[in-house]
């Protein structure tokens, strides 16, 4: 009996010691002073910044299969002061970047188990086949602190050249007679992004509406808009965020709309999360919204902030468990020291629908468990809190790898450098290794998204052409 007990204890000890804790596998970067591949947008914006500056890549981040990822910059470079009537936003054309993440195992003894080399393979501009509403410039004339400002039309010049309607980050591109959920507004502030299971389209959430749009992945043309619950929208619009906040008693707070977006592994349900509480809610209670892609039916659940000042991302573990990125605004880019950059596991399986509720929703909030403290984990690799990016916003699982003989899930986390590389550094990508044992410690499991083996949508067309050519050749041989 004693021998059996000793054997059991030794077995348990070995199992515990061999189980890996979540660790940083690799760190990579893309030059924040570089430009993307959209040469047509290379000209200077209203604020003098190049319209194709390669920045803000971590606002949204999604796996597209293999080593391919999609990154969505937000509404563009608006940190350069030029016109307070539009909160310094410019006619930056919204887009997403297709990236290759080359992850290669290092020799033993290296500080990191892998090396990560990101590269940019494509830039896709986002557009609509139907007309959008742009600011006329008339509403953008006035005086601020004794200085008079004026604006031109908010439509990008590229509209006329390419005979299309591009979405832009400029805050006055809306119809003032309609609410913020009007899908004909040209203003768009992309945040979360996910790739459909067939690999042919992308879903992108936004802060202005909030909206969730589906775009054709090859062309960037909008396919459809999902109608979100009316209580998320505001009825009185303004090109100035502070004015919009002060004039609305309900709806999303300006610049803090649907910050994160997840897609369940089966590709059937979108799960969006707001960055901050709605105007009608209190006690740090913000909302999670699920959308059935086929039926468009929505549900709302509550999430209680505990450490950070807001939420930046959500990604799926399975059909009911998710990881949520909760953070403060401190760190590199803010000139301060990062404190709260934490990833929590949540579970919606027994959550209460709060669609018809408002106020203090904290008692209805989903359960949450701390999974990764990013500041602590990066500190283990010698990265000081002052060098941890202030805006850790993108999060996505990628391909599994083997680490010391253990199958390990890769969790990619990216920063939004606000198009300010001189202050916030380059576009950074952190790869964390997550094992099933790590997930079991917080009562979670992981199911990978069922993405196609061929990640690039253009390849489908090439394959189709190739099949036709092969068929023609076969017929000739006959």
Language model regions located:
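Hydrophobic alpha-helical membrane context
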Residues: 14-15, 218, 468, 478
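Positively charged n-region of N-terminal signal peptides that target proteins for export
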Residues: 1-4, 456, 474-478
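A short, hydrophobic C-terminal helix/tail in secreted or cell-surface proteins
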Residues: 455-474
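Sec-dependent signal peptide recognition
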Residues: 2-8, 459-462
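Sequence/structural signature of beta-propeller domains
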Residues: 21-452
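Bacterial N-terminal signal peptides
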Residues: 7-15
């Amino acid at each position: 009996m004693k021998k059996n007990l000793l054997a059991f204890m030794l077995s348990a000890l070995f199992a515990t010691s061999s189980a890996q804790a979540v660790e940083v596998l690799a760190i990579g970067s893309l030059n924040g002073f570089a430009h993307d591949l959209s040469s047509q947008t290379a000209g200077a914006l209203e604020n003098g910044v190049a319209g194709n500056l390669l920045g803000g890549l971590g606002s949204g981040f999604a796996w597209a299969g293999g080593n391919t990822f999609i990154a969505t910059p937000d509404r563009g470079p608006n940190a350069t002061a030029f016109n307070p009537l539009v909160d310094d936003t410019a006619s930056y054309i919204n887009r997403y970047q297709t990236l290759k993440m080359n992850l290669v195992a290092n020799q033993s003894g290296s500080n990191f188990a892998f090396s990560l080399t990101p590269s940019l393979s494509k830039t896709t501009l986002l557009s609509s086949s139907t007309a959008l509403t742009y600011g006329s410039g008339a509403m953008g004339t006035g005086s601020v602190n004794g200085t008079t400002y004026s604006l031109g039309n908010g439509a990008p010049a590229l509209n006329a050249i390419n005979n299309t309607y591009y979405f832009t980050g400029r805050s006055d591109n809306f119809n003032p007679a309609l609410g913020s959920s009007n899908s004909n507004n040209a203003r768009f502030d992309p945040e979360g992004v996910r790739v459909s299971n067939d690999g042919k389209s992308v879903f992108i959430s936004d802060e202005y509406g909030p909206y969730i749009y589906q775009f054709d992945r090859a062309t960037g043309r909008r396919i459809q808009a999902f109608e979100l619950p009316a209580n998320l929208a505001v009825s009185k619009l303004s090109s100035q965020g502070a004015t919009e906040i002060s004039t609305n008693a309900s709806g999303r707070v300006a610049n803090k709309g649907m910050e994160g977006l997840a897609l369940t592994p089966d590709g059937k349900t979108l799960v969006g999360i707001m960055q901050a509480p709605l105007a009608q809610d209190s006690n740090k209670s913000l909302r999670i919204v699920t959308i059935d892609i086929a039926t468009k039916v929505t549900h709302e659940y509550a999430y209680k902030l505990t450490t950070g000042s807001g939420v930046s991302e959500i990604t799926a573990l399975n059909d009911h468990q998710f990881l949520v990125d909760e953070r403060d605004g401190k760190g590199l880019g803010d000139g301060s020291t990062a404190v709260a950059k934490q990833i929590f596991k949540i579970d919606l399986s027994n959550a209460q629908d709060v669609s018809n509720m408002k106020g203090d929703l904290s008692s209805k909030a989903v359960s949450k468990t701390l999974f990764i403290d990013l500041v602590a984990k990066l500190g283990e690799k010698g990265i000081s809190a002052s060098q941890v990016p202030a805006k850790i916003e993108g999060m996505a699982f990628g391909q599994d790898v083997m680490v010391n003989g253990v199958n390990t899930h890769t969790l990619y986390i990216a920063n939004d450098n606000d198009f300010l590389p001189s202050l916030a550094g380059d576009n950074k990508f952190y790869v964390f290794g997550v094992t099933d044992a790590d997930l079991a410690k917080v009562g979670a499991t992981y199911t990978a998204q069922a993405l196609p083996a061929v990640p690039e949508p253009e390849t489908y067309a090439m394959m189709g052409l190739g099949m036709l050519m092969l068929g023609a050749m076969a017929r000739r041989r006959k």
